[in-house]
Swiss-Prot record:
Protein's UniProt keywords contain Cell division: yes
Protein's gene: murA
Protein name stated in the entry: UDP-N-acetylglucosamine 1-carboxyvinyltransferase
Phylogenetic lineage: Bacteria, Pseudomonadati, Pseudomonadota, Alphaproteobacteria, Maricaulales
Active site: 117
Residue positions where 2-(S-cysteinyl)pyruvic acid O-phosphothioketal is found in the record: 117
């Protein structure tokens, strides 16, 4: 199993190209099931998660081929199978999003309940509620969801989500695009990835209004066409590299990043003493040598502070002047990185969904272990800022969400390398 070795203390200077958003790309891949024409995705991130989903789509009959310049071509000319087995779905919960498209196109599907990061209870109840609102009959047995559409296919309906679930909103949008009539999603998620999916589905022929607001209206079509679509820039990757620059010190441009997609984060970083500004081709982040100020944050659905940047921000606050309070309101059990940051010298106390971070003057390198995707990259950030050598073990988590992480950081001056076991 690979590990990442970091020699801390180097400033980050230069440019980092931001990849397409993983959380958007996976739903766009699932959208290829809605049409018998080719779907071509550009700025497609090359990640373990996208490979996992690609294998599942191939099993369902989709032709999947990589092109040059971060391009992925998917062609579901026919659906060979509507069964998504456990061994393919368990690796990543986003695989569950094939259920709606299969149901909408073929009228039936059987999909395993999902796996993925072990972050609290992340049920699919809202996904199933949305599909039921479109007329689907749902049965759950022995770890599988069996779904059947009414005669004539799914029918538009009213979907009122109890909270703004990103996954349920996206799943409903996918299925509703091939449903008869209008679907209205109330209390819809507002993340930029929702808008990206809406843009793609609209280009395929669906009529969608209100993406980015709490009410989305979808006029389904009997048939959707192929499309070439550029995946939106990854706002979490943007946040991660911005926080890395802030922690290690330096001045870098994040190419392709969209300033408007991380306003809450930029506000907190600015309050801490980090410079963040829009430039012609992205976002510039800079920090001088002075110690940062502590800042309290609370994770919230977009446009609030993103839960997927909480661990990375905690790494930054571990070096700030004073104490900060970090409240996690989205997922339970999402402070698993705190004990590992403590191995590097961080002073963190966790009480339920709240962590108190007492800033220290310096962190010191040590062996640490990644527990999930965002936790693993928070340890990389801390290692970049620490004195001496940090070794991050179990880095397969990183490969699920970050493309060429070591190369991107090395290009800005970081001393970081990946080593296989035994090396």
């Amino acid at each position: 199993m690979d590990r990442i070795v970091i020699q801390g203390g180097a400033r980050l200077e230069g440019r980092i190209e931001i990849s397409g958003a993983k959380n958007s790309a996976l739903k766009l891949m699932a959208a290829a099931l809605l049409t018998d024409e080719p779907v071509i995705l550009t700025r497609m991130p090359r990640l373990a998660d996208s490979r996992f989903l690609g294998h599942l789509l191939e099993k369902l009959g989709v032709e999947v081929s990589d092109g040059q310049d971060a391009q992925l071509r998917l062609h579901a000319a026919t659906i060979a199978d509507t069964f998504a087995p456990y061994d393919l779905v368990r690796k990543m919960r986003a695989s569950f999003n094939v259920l709606g498209p299969l149901l909408a196109r073929e009228g039936h599907a059987r999909v395993s309940l999902p796996g993925g990061c072990a972050i609290g209870a992340r049920p699919v109840d809202l996904h199933l509620k949305a599909l039921k609102a479109l007329g689907a009959q749902i049965e759950i047995s022995e770890g599988y969801v069996s779904a059947k559409a009414p005669a004539g296919g799914l029918v538009g309906g009213e979907i009122d989500l109890p909270f703004a679930s990103v996954g349920a909103t996206e799943h409903a949008m996918l299925a509703a695009s091939l449903a008869r009539g209008e679907t209205v999603i109330e209390n819809a998620a507002r993340e930029p990835e929702i808008g990206d999916l809406a843009d793609c589905l609209t280009a395929m022929g669906a009529t969608i209004e209100g993406a980015g607001s709490s009410t989305i209206r979808i006029q389904g079509q009997s048939r959707l066409s192929g499309v070439t679509h550029k995946v939106v820039a990854d706002r979490i990757e943007t946040a991660t590299y911005a926080l890395a620059v802030a922690a290690a010190g330096g001045d870098a441009v994040l190419e392709g990043a969209v300033l408007a997609h991380n306003k809450a984060l930029w506000s907190s970083m600015g309050e801490a003493g980090v410079t963040v500004e829009a430039v012609a081709d992205g976002v510039r982040v800079a920090r001088n040598g002075s110690r940062l100020d502590s800042v309290d944050i609370e994770t919230q659905p977009f446009p609030g502070f993103p839960t997927d940047a909480q661990a990375q921000f905690m790494a930054l606050m571990s070096l700030a002047n004073g104490s900060s309070v970090i409240r996690e309101t989205i997922f339970e059990n999402r402070f698993m990185h705190a004990p590992e940051l403590a191995r590097l010298g961080a002073d963190i106390t966790v009480h339920g969904n709240e962590a108190v971070v007492r800033g220290v003057e310096r962190l010191r390198g040590a062996p640490v272990m990644a527990t999930d995707l965002r936790a693993s990259v928070s340890l990389v950030i801390a290692g970049l800022a620490a004195e001496g050598e940090t070794v991050v073990n179990r880095v397969y988590h990183l490969d699920r969400g970050f493309e060429r992480l070591e190369a991107k950081l090395t290009g800005c001056g970081a001393r970081i390398e990946r080593l296989p076991d035994g090396a």
